[in-house]
């Protein structure tokens, strides 16, 4: 980890997640989730998750692609993605789903 990866003191850190990375066609990369716990300091987390309907296919937004920036992901079905992610997270019954598996 380099010093530019560390949040500023008192800053609010927002983990945008994989969906925004796909929507933005990699303009806004999702960071690796990692938390550092310090025994002598308080740490507050307020998770908020936005999930589309399971029938949703998400892909780079039209405003994020052009002739110089073609789509970097094929459409990702949310139900399929979440099922694969859950299998990797909880059941350990398969490959952990990553957006890189949908890269073009």
Regions found by a protein language model. Name each.
Residues 4-104:
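C-terminal flanking tails of non-heme Fe-dependent oxygenases
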